[in-house]
Amino acid sequence: MKKFSRILVVLAVLSMAMGLMTGCGNKKSEKSDNQSSVEQIKKNGKIKVGVFSDKPPFGYVDKNGKNQGYDVVLAHRLAKDLLGDENKVEFVLVEAASRVEFLQSNKVDVILANFTVTDERKEVVDYALPYMKVSLGVVSPNGKVITDVKQLKGKKLIVNKGTTAETYFTQKYPDIELLKYDQNTEAFNALKDGRGAALAHDNTLVYAWARENKGFTTGIKSLGEHDFIAPAVKKGND
């Protein structure tokens, strides 16, 4: 776990620094936008980073009200890189469905909330280099483990709004009834309460959750495309 965390830190800091400071294009206007964005962050004296409040081990708020997780570590490193002080970061709590809106409305400078790169999202945000590769996973109760999507016929599948899981099952399996929730906590509680037969999310998340919650198994370990997770900034601020 510690080795994985260190790898994520190095890769993410490099990708975010490249994304925020060098840009992806060659146009003068893009370079000007990049400089303006970084200069504004420096002028503000802090960087506002969107993170999850309930998605361990990536982003969560602990019992003392403190932000924790890989994404939080990455945010501190980014603040150190840009501003010379890892504490010059303001954490803004986001839900999956609000990540784009928070960027577009300047509520955050960067999204570090397990944001999967998709063609649709590329039209409205700019991504830095990816730092993690994921696919979808499906977790379900022991004794009623879902190992094939066909087993979900006539059953309810729990997903989070605004996630790749919601998009995937809506497009590929429109006959499967989806129970949609805003917060990860709500979704996983729904699974515990038996409101759905299974829950679909990024496989990295469901693996971690199943390890911490006895009585549940990730029966479908990889589903759909292998996608990438990357930091995102407002369109034009790449």
Regions found by a protein language model. Name each.
Residues G19-G23:
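C-terminal motif of bacterial Sec signal peptides marking the signal peptidase cleavage site
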Residues G25-K31, V72-V73, R77-D81, K161-T163, ...:
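Extended ligand-binding regions for polar small-molecule ligands
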Residues K31-I111:
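Extracytoplasmic small-molecule ligand-binding "clamshell" domains
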Residues I47-K48, D85-N87, V94, Q104-A113, ...:
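Alpha-to-beta junction loops
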Residues I47-V51, Q68, V149-T163:
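Short loop->beta-strand "edge-of-pocket" segments that line small-molecule binding or catalytic clefts
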Residues S53, M132-S140, N203, Y207-D238:
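Periplasmic-binding protein-like
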Residues H76, K88-Q151, T218:
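Acidic, polar ligand-binding/catalytic clefts
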Residues S98, F115-E123, Y168-Q171, K192-H226:
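A ligand-binding cleft/hinge motif common to bilobed small-molecule-binding domains
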